[in-house]
Amino acid sequence: MAVRSKSSKAWLHEHVNDHYVHMAQKDGYRARAAYKLLEINEKDKLIKPGTVLADLGSAPGSWSQVAAKLTGTSGAVFALDILPMEAIGGVSFIQGDFRENDVLAQFETLLDNRPLDLVICDMAPNMSGNAVSDQARSFYLCELALDFASQHLKTGGSFLVKVFQGAGYQEYMAAMREIFGTVQTRKPEASRNRSSEIYLLGKNKR
């Protein structure tokens, strides 16, 4: 039997005693991350009935669950991930790498010339334990998401992305400011205090 490290034991203890984990189980969300999006949306009103949005790196699907409830039948939610994701009512899921032409073609077919109001991205790489390489891989994913948003969002659209503060953060903020009229930071209560994660919100795409 594998011996758990002190850090994994601490994570397990925190997870078992996590208020948001219990709430997610009670409310039927697939992950506690749902409450991060709910809190941000409460403040910024990004998702409302009729919103058309793409959820990048969607698995296991808690952000797509929230989005589907908020957009209602008049909106549309497109979820994309390399990993499989169990079906969610009101969500069109494409399994594949959103950099690839065939995946983009599927997305554009489903979008059917509707303007894309919002791109949301809660992606993170599989962490190796090497802080330098993990940070670089994280921002690489963020850059891919920003490129997707810049290509597909309508003028005036919004982009919400998770980043980790550290090397590359200021440069990424600068890149977002070139594309969006305003860029703001959000740190929802459901984000663990010890985590360096923060959400960047770009509004009013140029």
Swiss-Prot record:
It comes from the Bacteria. InterPro entries: RNA_methyltr_RlmE (IPR050082), RNA_MeTrfase_FtsJ_dom (IPR002877), rRNA-MeTfrase_E (IPR015507), SAM-dependent_MTases_sf (IPR029063). The keyword Protein biosynthesis does not apply. Its EC number is 2.1.1.166. Keywords: Cytoplasm, Methyltransferase, rRNA processing, S-adenosyl-L-methionine, Transferase. One of its GO terms (molecular function) is rRNA (uridine-2'-O-)-methyltransferase activity. SUPFAM superfamilies: S-adenosyl-L-methionine-dependent methyltransferases. GO terms for cellular component: cytoplasm. It is found in: Cytoplasm. Its main location: cytoplasm. One of its GO terms (biological process) is RNA methylation. S-adenosyl-L-methionine binds at G61, W63, D81, D97, D122. It catalyses: uridine(2552) in 23S rRNA + S-adenosyl-L-methionine = 2'-O-methyluridine(2552) in 23S rRNA + S-adenosyl-L-homocysteine + H(+). It holds the Pfam family FtsJ. It is an enzyme of class 2 (transferase). Coiled coil: none annotated. The active site is at K162 (proton acceptor). Belongs to the class I-like SAM-binding methyltransferase superfamily. RNA methyltransferase RlmE family. PANTHER family: RIBOSOMAL RNA METHYLTRANSFERASE, RRNA METHYLTRANSFERASE 2, MITOCHONDRIAL. HAMAP family: RNA_methyltr_E. Specifically methylates the uridine in position 2552 of 23S rRNA at the 2'-O position of the ribose in the fully assembled 50S ribosomal subunit. This is Ribosomal RNA large subunit methyltransferase E.
